[in-house]
Regions:
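Gly/Ala-rich beta-loop-alpha elbow adjacent to hydrolase catalytic centers
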Residues: 97-101, 105
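C-terminal catalytic histidine-bearing segment of alpha/beta-hydrolase fold enzymes
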Residues: 164-202
């Protein structure tokens, strides 16, 4: 499994960034770069076979291959194992996931592997509402999701212990500068919410 981290600077916090169907692309690398000023070490493991990275125009192929392997459940298990492997070196292990990476983060949050999680527009969380995170979890949705009702899902999560939901008036992918749905304003707002929720400081 491919993995990248910054050189350790004596930080006691690790942040794992979980990728979308495309793998560790420029968006995920950009997220890692944004985290550099914070007091943490950043990891961007690749969970696709052979560390492959798909271009955005290959979305259909990327989706087809992802559903074949590792799939959401498989990525969730691999992510939990990866996070557990960091515990020997870090007091806190946090996870930030996007899209399928967000749903995988949601699954991992129910295993005790992470100490805090942020899930950016994990649309398939709706298929795993039986999960009870064992650590604080912020679930950020785009208001405009064509495949499901965001209010219906947030209503199911509102009384869930340790779970906070946040909805932005945007479309799926609004935090990705390379997406046609990118919103600089709401991306900045969501990022501020995420770092505060995880207790990350500069």
């Amino acid at each position: 499994m491919a993995s990248h981290s910054r050189d350790s600077n004596g930080h006691d916090t690790a942040v794992v960034v979980a990728h979308e169907i495309y793998g560790v692309n420029e968006h995920i690398s950009g997220v890692a770069k944004m985290l550099r000023p914070y007091r943490c070490d950043v990891f961007t493991p690749g969970f696709l076979p052979s560390g492959v990275v798909y271009a955005r125009e290959d979305e259909s192929e990327a989706y087809r291959q992802f559903t074949r392997t590792p799939g959401v459940a498989g990525m969730g298990n691999a992510l939990a194992q990866y996070a557990e492997g960091l515990r020997e070196r870090y007091r806190r292990v946090l996870c930030i996931g996007f899209s399928v990476g967000a749903t995988s983060t949601w699954l991992a949050s129910g295993t005790g592997a992470v100490d805090g999680a942020v899930c950016f527009y994990g649309s398939r969380i709706r298929d795993h509402l039986d999960i009870q995170p064992t650590a604080p979890c912020l679930v950020i949705f785009a208001e405009q999701e064509p495949s499901f009702s965001v209010p219906a899902i947030t209503e199911r999560l509102v009384d869930r212990k340790g779970v906070v939901t946040e909805v932005h008036p945007c479309r799926h992918g609004f935090c990705d500068p390379g997406s046609p749905h990118y919103s600089a304003v709401h991306s900045r707002q969501a990022w501020t919410s995420a770092t505060r929720f995880l207790g990350l400081s500069r």
